[in-house]
Amino acid sequence: MSVFRAVSQLTPARIWDGVLARPLHADRVTIGFVDIDPGVLVPEHRHDNEQVGFVQRGSVTMTIAGQSRELRVGETYSIAGGVPHSARAGADGASVVDVFAPVREDWKTAPTVDPFPGRWPEPSR
């Protein structure tokens, strides 16, 4: 695999109904470029991976360890491994960038869909 890829060329994986992630895996981390359809709830879940992220488009209400906050473009979040969390996209949906350590092995086997540009910018070359 090339070390250089456009986000739009990464193969999307269906993580939940209404949630597509374009994962990029390295040896110790996974970065996910995630699109959440308008109003979709990412149900409460937990994983051993640490997770940090930011909102790139739209808005999302994150609930982390029972605390909720609406996040907008440019705002960040941090979730320790094992902590329960959920998210609900705003009326226009959301695109977030998530970084996980260690690698999200479960995302490697998630069902995929054919790549398409989606909501991520095309390279400007």
Task: List where the protein language model places each region.
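A short, N-terminal "cap"/entry segment at the start of jelly-roll beta-barrel domains
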Residues: M1-R28, T109-R125
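Structural motif
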Residues: T30, S59-T61, S68, P84, ...
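Short, conserved beta-strand element in jelly-roll/cupin
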Residues: D35-D37, H47-M62
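Short acidic-glycine-tyrosine-enriched beta hairpin
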Residues: G66-G81
